[in-house]
């Protein structure tokens, strides 16, 4: 009963975290729901960039790839390698999920450094990278959790839950809490790094607007890419772990 209570409290904590606000926000009222407009707007822009780029790159595929097609094939091979390394031989069906996570986070992170979100005026708050908002990172982390539970149950059925008493039943509470704390670590790592990067750039621009921010922005682009890779790699590792049933 105590374990169940702890798990429920952890899930409730994740729900409460999704309501955390940093600064002012702009909302839309749709029916009886309050929608976070800033995150939706910037997420739609990121999705449009991804869909537009992919469409332009593969609208006229060539036997010998050139330019955009060559770049996207390289990205696909990179994602396949990451998925195969972490998941194993059954990685194929998970490449679209891992690739979607990686590309969305990567473009979202870079949009925070390259796109002039601040020049777009809103009634309240301001636009920023989607991953600069805790609501986005928690949603991505919860999707990852659903994915690795689905992977484990699909592969092993109800026998998947046997891992919680391995190597000894004494570890049952710890093993259960481990699965519910994975989304916390994923979401806070991504949110904290992207928010900190944007805050550092804003502070330096206000202090030394012409010189110092440039190398810091390049460093931000590098760390943004690394954060996308870390998230995708951990997501693939969690899925592979749930299918293999070991820690």
From Swiss-Prot:
The keyword Chloroplast applies. It is found in: Plastid, Chloroplast thylakoid membrane. GO terms for cellular component: chloroplast thylakoid membrane; plasma membrane; proton-transporting ATP synthase complex. Keywords: ATP synthesis, CF(0), Chloroplast, Hydrogen ion transport, Ion transport, Membrane, Plastid, Thylakoid, Transmembrane, Transmembrane helix, Transport. CDD domains: ATP-synt_Fo_a_6. One of its GO terms (molecular function) is proton-transporting ATP synthase activity, rotational mechanism. The chain crosses the membrane at residues 38-58, 95-115, 134-154, 199-219, 220-240. Key component of the proton channel; it plays a direct role in the translocation of protons across the membrane. NCBIfam families: ATP_synt_6_or_A. Belongs to the ATPase A chain family. This is ATP synthase subunit a, chloroplastic. The lineage of its organism: Eukaryota, Viridiplantae, Streptophyta, Embryophyta, Tracheophyta. The gene is atpI.
């Amino acid at each position: 009963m105590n374990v169940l209570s702890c798990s429920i409290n952890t899930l409730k904590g994740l729900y409460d975290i999704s309501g955390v606000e940093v600064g002012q926000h702009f909302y839309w009222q749709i029916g009886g729901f309050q929608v976070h407009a800033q995150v939706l707007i910037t997420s739609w822009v990121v999705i449009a960039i991804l869909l537009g780029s992919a469409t332009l790159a593969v609208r006229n595929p060539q036997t010998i790839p050139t330019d955009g097609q060559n770049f996207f094939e390289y990205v696909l091979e990179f994602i396949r390698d990451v998925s195969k390394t972490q998941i194993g031989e059954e990685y194929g069906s998970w490449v679209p999920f891992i690739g979607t996570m990686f590309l969305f986070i990567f473009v979202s992170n870079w949009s925070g450094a390259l796109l002039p979100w601040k020049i777009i005026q809103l009634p309240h708050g301001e636009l920023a990278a989607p991953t600069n908002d805790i609501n986005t990172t928690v949603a991505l982390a919860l999707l990852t959790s659903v994915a690795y539970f689905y992977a484990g149950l699909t592969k092993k059925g109800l026998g998947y839950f046997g891992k919680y008493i391995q190597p000894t039943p004494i570890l049952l509470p710890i093993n259960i809490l481990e699965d519910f704390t994975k989304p916390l670590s994923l979401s806070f790592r991504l949110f904290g790094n992207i928010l900190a990067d944007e805050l550092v750039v804003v502070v330096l621009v206000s202090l030394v607007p012409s010189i110092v921010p440039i190398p810091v922005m390049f460093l931000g682009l590098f760390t943004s890419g690394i954060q996308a890779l870390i998230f995708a790699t951990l997501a693939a590792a969690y899925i592979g772990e749930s299918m293999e049933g070991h820690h």
